[in-house]
Amino acid sequence: MIESHEFNDINDSHVGVDINSLESTTSTSASYCATSGGFMNLTLISGHLKQVWVEYDGVKKQINVTLAPINVDKPKIPLLSLSGDLSPIINKAMYVGFSSTTGSILTSHYVLGWSFKMNGKAQEVAILNFPSCLEVKAELNI
């Protein structure tokens, strides 16, 4: 990751929610809520696999973003919560996505699994069905 002062990034290892802008509506340093209840810092450029849950409750108008290492169950407390009505920007057909930047450092970023559900809970992503590259197998101890 890279810190961009142009877009008011808080640091070079953060998670943000950007809505129709490159400037985050809200952001925080990358971390996850451990089972002990405290937040543990994560370094996004560590090379270790991570999983992210992005959830929007249209009734409550609540966006939650939860982050954790790949071998950790979904934390009970999200990393970011944001109240806001997304209905004015959600269309019947549209694109959503993830982005990442590392400045001048050459890196690759992969989305290894994706689950989406309208009006309900998305299915769990089957980690064992991830691509069988060595890095994934080593990280998952399989």
Where are the predicted features?
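Polar, low-complexity loop segments and adjacent catalytic/binding residues used for recognizing
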Residues: M1-I142
